[in-house]
Amino acid sequence: MGTDTAQATARPVRTQQPGRLIVDWLTTTDHKKIGHLYLITSFAFFLIGGVMALVMRAELARPGMQIVDNNQFNQLFTLHGTIMLLLFATPTFAGFANEIMPLQIGSPDVAFPRLNMLSYWLFLFGGLIVLGSLAVPSGPAAFGWFAYAPLNSLERSPGIGADMWIMGLALAGFGTILGSVNFLTTIIGMRAPGMTMFRMPIFTWNTLFTSILVLMAFPVLAAALLVLEADRRFGSQVFDAANGGALLWQHLFWFFGHPEVYIIALPFFGIITEIIPVFSRKPIFGYLTLIGATAAITGLSVVVWAHHMFATGAVLLPFFSFMSFLIAVPTGVKFFNWTGTMLKGSLSFETPMLWATGFLVSFLFGGLTGVILASPPLDFHVTDSYFVVAHFHYVVFGTVVFATFGGFYFWWPKFTGKMLDERLGKIHFWTLFVGFHTTFLVQHWLGAEGMPRRYADYLAADGFTALNTLSTIGAFLLGMSTLPFLYNVWKTARYGRKVEVDDPWGFGRSLEWTTSCPPPRHNFVTLPRVRSESPAFDLHHPAHAGEAPQPEPKHEQADREPS
């Protein structure tokens, strides 16, 4: 037996053929590879949606129709909004959750690896169906990403492109629902010994709350989409305007739509919360209040949907206005936590910290204009104007894109075993930051001056030309900022040095920084003891470990008592 074992271990390791590599990735159930697939696919959708935005901005730079006609413009903003929210932002959450969450709780994988794989394929093919509507003769859907009735009816949107939009989103939505079931089960049932709920990293907490929100919001969207398809193809009349169907659609859609904004915000808040303590050299300020604020946002986000419907005159304005003001309070608490962590910290502005700081500035602007829009008298004046477009992009782009790039630069060594180039990262950040604010800051003024959203053209006499031209210049700078990032990824993959340590930043706090870069197939060779919410810091800096230790659970104490 000893000889056989020696011979077995002496066999040379076979290099994997390209064909086998492709099959391995297509059939993988490894949460890290599935996370890679989510992030790569969603970033590809981000690039496609960005090109659509640049075409629209090029059209709006000057009065008159230059590039696209009215219907093509409608198709562009419909697909742009759909792609960015449902095919980029939402699956990017799933990508980061797959990559990082099992590592942070000390789990070898997610609870249902095959369901995880199915979730990705549902998202991919749902997204391809939506994008495939570009190839049909009648063109893609042109009714806006919230598909208001009666515009979404067969009479007003007769092409097959609208049906592909509906069924593609339903399919991708089922993938999101199944993925959230997986994340919830993993967090509740697969934590490492010692990893109590109140020792979990904030990103994992936010993944938990986001998954709960998905299970409340996405089934409503899926049901509404399937009923809409029944209206279009089987003659049911649920969303018929004569039966009040137009308002019914708005209620159903926004009951999904507003939680969706927090579905694509909370996990990215979590990413920022992971980055700031590492580059402040301090534990997160107010760990418990951060969790409480996230719980409050989760609860409040399902009772504010009708602030999107103030202009209908058919909703209770005082209630929805008050609840919309109220949701700003826990968000403000988070800001105190983030700035409190940075205060008196030993700050260093490596690229991930730059993105986190850029997020704080951008999201603060978006939050302040959100408080303005929560007031019905003010909302009546700027609803469906570029003021709303600017607010929405400050909130969503300011959160999702800044935090996504921050997460990429922060966890890239954990994903790939190589560090992205810092100089290129800083060029990337500053070009994107300047381009973003140049694009969207002026749109607040355009909206206040009365420029409606979703118009393909305007008159020179309207006085919108100068600000639109400036916004378009900013948009192209914003688009160009992606080039240094893509070059950085290529350069790092080709020439980057291998990371030899578990924690290349030196001050990582959560459990993913206690395993190799990249981790082995089942994540950990050995698990360190978890005695606080910063197990990696405790392991690598034992002199400072447990400066504010939490009491250990009774069952752990009992396990160590001599029998």
From Swiss-Prot:
GO biological process, one term: respiratory electron transport chain
Cofactor(s) named in the record: Cu(2+); heme
Superkingdom per UniProt: Bacteria
SUPFAM superfamilies for this protein: Cytochrome c oxidase subunit I-like
Catalytic activity entry: 4 Fe(II)-[cytochrome c] + O2 + 8 H(+)(in) = 4 Fe(III)-[cytochrome c] + 2 H2O + 4 H(+)(out)
Main location as per UniProt: membrane
Positions bound to Cu cation: H258, Y262, H307, H308
Ligand binding (heme a3): H391
Cofactor note: Binds 1 copper B ion per subunit.
Pathway: Energy metabolism; oxidative phosphorylation
Annotated residues for binding of Fe(II)-heme a: H80, H393
Region feature (Disordered): 536-563
This enzyme's EC code(s): 7.1.1.9
Residue ranges, compositional bias (Basic and acidic residues): 552-563
Pfam families noted in UniProt: COX1
Quaternary structure note: Associates with subunits II, III and IV to form cytochrome c oxidase.
Function: Cytochrome c oxidase is the component of the respiratory chain that catalyzes the reduction of oxygen to water. Subunits 1-3 form the functional core of the enzyme complex. CO I is the catalytic subunit of the enzyme. Electrons originating in cytochrome c are transferred via the copper A center of subunit 2 and heme A of subunit 1 to the bimetallic center formed by heme A3 and copper B.
Protein name listed in UniProt: Putative cytochrome c oxidase subunit 1-beta
Organismal lineage: Bacteria, Bacillati, Actinomycetota, Actinomycetes, Kitasatosporales
UniProt gene name: ctaD2
